[in-house]
């Protein structure tokens, strides 16, 4: 066989099916759109589900893709074996009610034997036990040797998940060994031994399984195929595993270069190198597709992969930041197929660098605590770390659970995962209660998401805010209805509408619907899972009925304010690019009638000067009264025109481009003002960080901007009145008062110091001796932490061989400090252990070194008991 690189294989596959009249689609982003069942795209057909289910019309009945995928179900095995990986590409060709078995089977054989040139005596085919149709096609429409076709049962060659669409499949296998297998038993044995490997699965979706277990023929039969690019690359390159194929090996070589390690010389180092290679590739693609490191959902998947790779870099001796440099190797090997990698390379590197820096801080502090836990376990001969301690590491110090487990495993220890999960569940419940979460009408089981796929609503609301239409569907959260009466809430679909449905960060319209029989207010307009325009309504008079003519009226004033904020968002995006640089890209947005919120990629808080420049530029462009123009064009035309596209969006072939004069040009389906002058005024309200490398600006426009400035002005007037000065002198007056307060604080500190001066002699009068070690304890009043430490240090200096423990009730809070002479440590004295027990008595916590420790508490009434506890602990330590 001729050697073929992974990039060549990808192109050959897609070109082959283009020659069979398939539409080639670019890979969908790794972040699923409108699919709550998936965290990340994990299969080639996953983003095409709406086409298979009939919820959406495919752009063509024949489609081919190379879909990037992430699977983390067996992440613990990645690196430990050379077979597992988190990132992979799935080649696929799909038919939505077009061709079926008689076409795909000979095409598949043609591709692998003629295009790829795989020898026929190296191939085997499996079919479902009873699929005679597939057998007949294989034997009549291809020249496969019938003795190389094996029939297998449901577990191997039938695809189904519960009830719903399902069907048999045929799989194509490659034989890495010599000689022919003659029987099914020999075939299965060779497969289990990895001599024979499956590399292409053709699924024939021809049945609909009902609740009773009956298989009914589907009127529209579909084809869904999947071939792992990495798997076929191992075959075409004659290698045993994914880390040896050309593209992945190049990235592995980069990992070796950055860590100064050689692959193939040490098993443990090989594990670390494979983890860095695989995870480095995955995090590059995840960040490119808009995922940000976080502690939830897909953001946590990213953080986990990145931190696991960073730790294995440390195991290989890397001291500083290095993972961001892996990006270049990924871009070099995948950039032609995925040009967005090239465009976002600098941004990806910066996000990785920020996260790795943060992790290095986390791991340094967390590792010390974990190692102290492990030391305690070893002292007590314990083998299981408590779930509460692991949760504290995770929740308080940001130390990853998986890292805790991995380190414990390396030391032959275990984690009480059950109690960790219990702690996590309780925390989430507290957070949920704090947020006051509630479900929104329209779960996936609701009738609103079961509307007939053939129903189409024409949106005619860019210009028209009022039109007549016909009710085609009525319902509530429980069922479809023929009529909704006064006081009832539900949903309504019409054949056309002026109501904008929430999308692209813009909220849905509100307004009212009237008919001959009644009136309803529209509280919201959204799209259901099938993309249908759904009006959420409350009937306030009479009733609305299915099939009747209605008049739909959008709240014009509210829409106008939304338009101002949406157009201003586009202008803000462009202004940020001009002031900060081209690395700025939209990461999220929200637009309603009161304000706008814009999240964007940037690596530091904006300075006051930068914010002023951005705000001024937007207002200057508003005052040009530029025409806001909208045009429909092909996606390629839009890109060539310089229109801004969002990386995590999947666009149709025809797109809508919104231009604000010659200043801003973006792909957008939202509603906008007719000219920039309608916005009136733009005012930034706040700028903040929302995640690593993501900033957020909130702003207001028009009347809301004027009201905001009026509020600010009133606040200035009130402040000037309270400070008894002119508005222009407020800053000077505050600075002067701050200086006065600082001087007063200094005086207070000096007075407190005088109060405790010489107190050490009084404190030493209560000294006791325990087994040759001196113990001094004392309770003080209104002494702050700094003064308490100074006093303890002075007392310690007057001891020959001993420990001092001081406690102070400082405004209802307890300050504790313990200090010991160095020679007392040899007698068993340990301040950290003493202070830990003492702090518990006053409802606090703390710790420290053997020679010095401090803590706080909240129950000053227990100070006397706490100091008694100090004596008990010292007696135990110096026996």
UniProtKB/Swiss-Prot annotation:
Cofactor comment text: Binds 1 zinc ion per subunit.
GO MF entries: alanine-tRNA ligase activity; aminoacyl-tRNA deacylase activity; ATP binding; catalytic activity, acting on a protein; transferase activity; tRNA binding; zinc ion binding
EC number: 6.1.1.7
Cross-referenced CDD domains: AlaRS_core
Keywords recorded for this protein, A-Z: Aminoacyl-tRNA synthetase, ATP-binding, Cytoplasm, Ligase, Metal-binding, Nucleotide-binding, Protein biosynthesis, RNA-binding, tRNA-binding, Zinc
Gene3D superfamilies listed in its UniProt record: 2.40.30.130, 3.10.310.40, 3.30.54.20, 6.10.250.550, Bira Bifunctional Protein, Domain 2, Threonyl-trna Synthetase, Chain A, domain 2
Any GO BP: alanyl-tRNA aminoacylation
Cellular component terms (Gene Ontology): cytosol
Subcellular location: Cytoplasm
Binding positions for Zn(2+) per the UniProt entry: 566, 570, 668, 672
Enzyme class: ligase
Xref: HAMAP family: Ala_tRNA_synth_B (MF_00036_B)
Family: Belongs to the class-II aminoacyl-tRNA synthetase family.
Function: Catalyzes the attachment of alanine to tRNA(Ala) in a two-step reaction: alanine is first activated by ATP to form Ala-AMP and then transferred to the acceptor end of tRNA(Ala). Also edits incorrectly charged Ser-tRNA(Ala) and Gly-tRNA(Ala) via its editing domain.
Domain observations: Consists of three domains; the N-terminal catalytic domain, the editing domain and the C-terminal C-Ala domain. The editing domain removes incorrectly charged amino acids, while the C-Ala domain, along with tRNA(Ala), serves as a bridge to cooperatively bring together the editing and aminoacylation centers thus stimulating deacylation of misacylated tRNAs.
Protein name: Alanine--tRNA ligase
Species this protein is from: Clostridium perfringens (strain SM101 / Type A)
């Amino acid at each position: 066989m001729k050697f073929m690189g992974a990039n060549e294989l990808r192109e050959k596959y897609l070109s082959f099916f283009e020659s069979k009249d398939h539409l080639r689609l670019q890979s969908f982003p790794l972040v699923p759109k409108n699919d709550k069942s998936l965290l990340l795209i994990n299969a080639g057909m996953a983003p095409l589900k709406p086409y298979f289910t009939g919820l959406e019309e495919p752009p063509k009945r024949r489609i081919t893709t190379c879909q990037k995928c992430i699977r983390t179900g067996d992440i613990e095995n990645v690196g430990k074996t050379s077979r597992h990986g988190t990132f992979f590409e799935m080649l696929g060709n799909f038919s939505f009610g077009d061709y079926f078995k008689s076409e795909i089977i000979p095409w598949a054989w043609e591709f692998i034997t003629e295009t790829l040139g795989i020898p026929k005596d190296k191939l085997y085919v499996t079919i479902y036990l009873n699929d005679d149709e597939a057998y007949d096609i294989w034997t009549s429409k291809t020249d496969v040797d019938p003795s190389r076709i094996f029939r297998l049962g449901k577990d191997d060659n039938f695809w189904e998940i519960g009830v719903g669409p399902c069907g048999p499949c045929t799989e194509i296998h490659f034989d890495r060994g010599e000689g022919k297998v003659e029987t099914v038993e020999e075939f299965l044995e060779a497969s289990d031994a990895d001599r024979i490997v499956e590399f292409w699965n053709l699924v024939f979706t021809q049945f609909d399984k009902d609740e009773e277990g009956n298989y009914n023929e589907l009127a529209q039969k579909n084809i869904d195929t999947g071939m792992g690019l990495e798997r076929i690359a191992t075959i075409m390159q004659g290698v045993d595993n994914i880390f040896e194929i050309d593209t992945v090996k190049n990235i592995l070589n980069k990992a070796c270069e950055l860590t100064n390690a050689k692959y193939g010389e040490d098993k443990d180092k090989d594990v670390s190198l494979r983890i860095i290679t695989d995870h480095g590739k995955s995090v590059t693609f995840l960040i490119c597709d808009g995922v940000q490191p976080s502690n939830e959902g897909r953001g946590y998947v990213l953080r986990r992969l990145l931190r696991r790779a960073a730790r294995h870099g440390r195991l290989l001796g890397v001291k500083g930041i290095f993972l961001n440099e892996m990006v270049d190797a990924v871009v070099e090997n995948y950039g032609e197929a995925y040009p967005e990698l090239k465009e976002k390379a600098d941004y990806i590197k910066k996000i990785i660098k920020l996260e790795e820096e943060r992790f290095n801080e986390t791991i340094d502090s967390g590792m010390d605590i974990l190692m102290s836990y492990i030391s305690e376990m070893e002292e007590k001969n314990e083998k299981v770390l408590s779930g509460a301690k692991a949760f504290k590491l995770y929740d308080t110090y940001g130390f990853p659970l998986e890292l805790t487990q991995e380190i414990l495993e390396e030391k032959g220890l275990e984690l009480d995962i059950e109690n960790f999960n219990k702690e996590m569940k309780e925390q989430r419940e507290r957070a949920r209660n704090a947020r006051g979460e509630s479900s929104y009408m329209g779960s996936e089981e609701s009738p609103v998401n079961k509307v007939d796929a053939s129903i189409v609503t024409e949106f005619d609301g860019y210009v028209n805010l009022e039109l007549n239409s016909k009710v085609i569907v009525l319902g509530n959260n429980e069922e479809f209805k023929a009529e909704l009466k006064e006081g009832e809430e539900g949903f309504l679909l019409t054949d056309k509408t002026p109501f904008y449905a929430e999308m692209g960060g813009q909220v849905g319209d509100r307004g009212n619907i009237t008919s001959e029989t009644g009136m309803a207010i529209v509280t919201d307009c959204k799209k259901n899972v099938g993309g249908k325009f759904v009006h959420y309504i409350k009937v306030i008079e009479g009733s609305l009925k299915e099939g009747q003519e209605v008049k739909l009226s959008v709240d014009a004033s509210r829409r106008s304010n939304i338009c101002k904020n949406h157009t201003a968002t586009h202008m803000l995006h462009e202004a940020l690019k001009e002031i900060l640089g081209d690395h700025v890209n939209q990461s999220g947005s929200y637009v309603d009638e009161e304000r706008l919120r814009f999240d964007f990629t940037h690596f530091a808080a904006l300075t006051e000067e930068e914010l002023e420049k951005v705000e001024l530029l937007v207002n200057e462009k508003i005052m040009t009264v530029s025409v806001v123009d909208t045009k429909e064009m092909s996606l390629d035309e839009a890109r060539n025109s310089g229109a801004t596209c969002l990386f995590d969006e999947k666009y149709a072939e025809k797109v809508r481009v919104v231009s604000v004069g010659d200043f801003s040009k973006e792909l957008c389906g939202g509603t906008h003002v007719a000219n920039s002058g309608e916005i009136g005024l733009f005012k930034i309200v706040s700028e903040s960080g929302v995640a690593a490398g993501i900033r957020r600006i909130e702003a207001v426009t028009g009347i809301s901007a004027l009201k905001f400035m009026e509020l600010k002005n009133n606040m200035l007037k009130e402040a000037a009145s309270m400070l008894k000065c002119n508005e222009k002198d407020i800053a000077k007056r505050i600075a002067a008062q701050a200086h006065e307060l600082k001087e007063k604080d200094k005086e207070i500190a000096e007075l407190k110091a005088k109060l405790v001066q010489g107190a050490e002699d009084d404190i030493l009068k209560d000294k006791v001796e325990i087994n040759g070690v001196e113990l001094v304890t004392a309770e003080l009043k209104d002494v702050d932490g700094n003064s308490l430490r100074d006093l303890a240090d002075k007392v310690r200096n007057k001891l020959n061989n001993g420990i001092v423990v001081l406690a102070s009730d400082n405004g209802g809070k307890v300050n504790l400090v313990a200090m010991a002479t160095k020679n007392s440590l040899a007698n068993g004295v340990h301040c950290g252990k003493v202070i830990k027990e003492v702090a518990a008595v006053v409802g606090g916590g703390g710790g420290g070194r053997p020679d010095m420790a401090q803590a706080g508490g909240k129950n000053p009434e227990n100070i006397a008991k706490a100091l008694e506890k100090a004596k008990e602990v010292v007696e135990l330590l110096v026996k």
